């Protein structure tokens, strides 16, 4: 019996971690106009990786109503706001699914000390609202985000993320 439970747990974990969110997050980063400091190639690659991971984490947290995916990708105000969103969803029984995410990101400010980068993200995706797992609403959305990322020990973290009407 315990072997069956173990196999089921592994299959469930595998399906949750491979559920479409990660593969559906596409990010294009243009850092050519960042100032006053230019973004080094390796830094650009790491920011691209970590920003994609952040959106994968948002999608998983809001779809499965769990705070775990927010660890490591977010800090400060951004983590607090996302945690409140997940907690609110847990109370209401609703969840959100982000499908076919496409992010066109432009680095506009990179601090001379290299301790903060400002990104402008035009995000496009299908937003699905679910009630107890049942789809109740779906719409195609385009949202503009201003994002501040700061370096941590081994990655860049989203410190602030705010939707704005336009850049």
Residue map of PLM features:
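Short hydrophobic/aromatic segments of transmembrane alpha-helices and their interfaces
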Residues: 3-4, 51-53, 139-141
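Short, low-complexity N-terminal intrinsically disordered segments enriched in polar/charged residues
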Residues: 20-76
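Short solvent-exposed beta->alpha transition segments
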Residues: 38-41, 67-114
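Intrinsically disordered, low-complexity segments enriched in polar/charged residues with Gly/Pro
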Residues: 47-48, 94-97, 113, 134-137
């Amino acid at each position: 019996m315990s072997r069956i439970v173990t196999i089921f747990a592994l299959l469930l974990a595998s399906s949750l971690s491979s559920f479409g969110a990660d593969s559906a997050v596409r990010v294009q980063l243009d850092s050519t106009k960042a100032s006053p400091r230019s973004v080094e190639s390796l830094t650009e690659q790491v920011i691209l990786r970590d920003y994609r991971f952040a959106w994968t984490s948002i999608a998983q947290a809001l779809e499965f109503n769990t705070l775990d995916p927010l660890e490591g990708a977010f800090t400060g105000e951004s983590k607090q706001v996302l945690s409140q969103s997940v907690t609110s969803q847990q109370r209401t029984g609703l969840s959100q699914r982000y499908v076919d995410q496409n992010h066109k990101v432009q680095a506009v400010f990179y601090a001379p000390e290299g301790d903060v980068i400002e990104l402008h993200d035009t995000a496009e995706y299908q937003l699905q609202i679910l009630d107890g797992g049942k789809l109740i609403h779906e719409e195609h959305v385009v949202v503009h985000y201003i994002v501040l990322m700061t370096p941590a020990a081994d990655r860049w973290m989203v410190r602030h993320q705010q939707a704005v009407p336009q850049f």
